[in-house]
């Protein structure tokens, strides 16, 4: 690894012109928040339907608010602890330390606010979508309604709800980064590390907690309701139905919004750190200019989702909005690049690295092509994920056919599809990263900055992507409210069924793109980590390469310590995924026992003479989700600390590389296999292979219950895991070097920190493994025999 000069690190300054540009970008971010407010008013202006629908929606709202309030109180304590720990880490001065800790809290607050706002509006718009679909069924004596108009109205309400969440995501992300740059100028990249960590930590907890809640309720509801009792999904007789609908909002809405918000924040962190080195003064503003363009085009894309009569389905209108946004983004970025950036590397003020300043070529070409790679990558992943998860494509149809031979072949078919699709998606992301890397030529910093710019290119589509994702749970909840109330029938029910099918596809597609944003953000952060090692080594007077360079500073994979780090990084991804899935299994078991108890002790539930106790299941899911948060979170934070202080920063870099590689493949495998099982179930429920109630249907329900924690808990949680570990590594790298070399070298301190980190991980995993599989384990007096269903006895 070639040693780089470090004098350029303080050379870049925020010029008056760039300060004005960043201020304008901040105004664009505020405009996104204003537009979100306008969209909120439009959504809430729609009708709410019957009293029965309003009562069900109110129960969902109450459950979602109660869960998120308890979760945020829990995370608030954790955030305060991290605030003070960040003050202990090395920085150039106390102003930087204080700024890093303060903006950690701001990043955490923005991430939580994005998730909360997404959930708050989703639980209010779902009943409005159901009410809009209800208009399709005419009252006695009324003429037939225009189904296309009714469907378009319902689609617009659902997508505008997503648009609000999308605008808050990009608006708050961009506003936070702009505030840091305006306040701290050239020191902004260091302070932004705290902002990114706050966003990433809260997003990971919301992803894990929301995922456990939603899938415990979903799996429990399906196993007892569909498989054992033979009643439909969202049937009001199922005690887990309200919890299932609450989970859709706290998991898919709040979790995904926070996830993409932190991808946004973390990518900007990496782009500004590397931009300052690679593009000097211009590097402090250009990484903000690209996502600002994305904010403007997201506004266009959201309003472009206006269904037409010629559309084959609601997906046609959504795809149209996405591609219009992407194309306009590319055109505007091209204009911005050639207007803002100079035509020669020598004209990049603030760059003192001779390898960059003396480079021939045009920096505008590098910037434009790198951003274009990110935009094109988003479009390609959208199509690739759609191919493996849509009901109209061969892979899902093949899983549907396999249901004729039982649940085992359904599970096997889904696993093989997930494994295969992971390869293609990983290759596509890898090509994107490598293509951007090649743009840098002989300069490693330019190459890494190009990767970060590809990430910002991907970010230009985030506003529309969040809108697409939120569309899924809103349409799913709308169908649930309609079915529980019994007030939407005939054509109206079909409108909601069609919307739900589109929503399943949008959720699967956005998971694929979210994984790509996570990987590009992690890759860019990896570049920032390399820069941190370079700076830290120079501070203690050590070389990074050549004769006499310490082995623990080099990321040479032929060294045993680095190979161990690589394997450990991959292993953490597997352990994290296992913990998340096991948490769902335990909590789902508790839900199954509770729903069975209610059916057994309240026989009147089946003939509607008694009402289930919905609140009991909501309480179980809330308790278990919050209880299970600690172990995955501590693993993500403590594992890099243990590796870094034990094996050194070189092995820690290899650890991050192993985590990024394994995490990419694992996340895609879990997301696509789970999505394909879900849509195979929908395919059978639409009347194929025997339809609802058939053995094929029961087989696909089992497949779907296996896939639920795959696609909605473990898979999505890997995204913030990668970025949390990268940010922790980035923050501790100077401390690891400080206590390993130079005047402050201390083996005792390193060993003490490593032992504490390992003890915390071991204790967290031990406590997690000691918990029972289900609450029935703790109730030996239960005379009922345990189910022999292998999907229940997990």
Curated annotation (Swiss-Prot):
Regions crossing the membrane: 20-40, 74-94, 102-122, 163-183, 194-214, 264-284, 285-305, 321-341, 365-385, 422-442, 446-466, 508-528, 564-584, 641-661, 717-737, 747-767
Compartment(s) where it occurs, according to its Swiss-Prot or TrEMBL record: Cell membrane
Enzyme class of the recorded protein, top EC level: translocase
Entry binding sites for Ca(2+): 678, 704, 708
The keyword Acyltransferase is assigned to this record: no
Residues that hold Mg(2+) 1 according to the record: 218, 222
Bilayer topology annotation: Multi-pass membrane protein
Cofactors named for this entry: Mg(2+)
Binding site for substrate: 215, 711
Binding site for Mg(2+) 2: 245, 248, 476
Main location: membrane
Pfam families, alphabetized: H_PPase
InterPro entries cross-referenced by the UniProt entry: PPase-energised_H-pump (IPR004131)
MF term (GO), any: inorganic diphosphate phosphatase activity
Listed GO CC annotations: plasma membrane
Sorted UniProt keywords: Calcium, Cell membrane, Hydrogen ion transport, Ion transport, Magnesium, Membrane, Metal-binding, Translocase, Transmembrane, Transmembrane helix, Transport
Site (described: Determinant of potassium independence): 507
EC nos: 7.1.3.1
Residue ranges of coiled coil: none
Record site feature (Important for ion transport), residues: 207, 252, 259, 712, 723
Functional summary from the UniProt entry: Proton pump that utilizes the energy of pyrophosphate hydrolysis as the driving force for proton movement across the membrane. Generates a proton motive force.
NCBIfam families in the cross-refs: PRK00733.1-4, PRK00733.3-5, V_PPase
Family: Belongs to the H(+)-translocating pyrophosphatase (TC 3.A.10) family. K(+)-insensitive subfamily.
Subunit and partners: Homodimer.
Annotated protein name in UniProt: K(+)-insensitive pyrophosphate-energized proton pump
Protein encoded by which gene: hppA
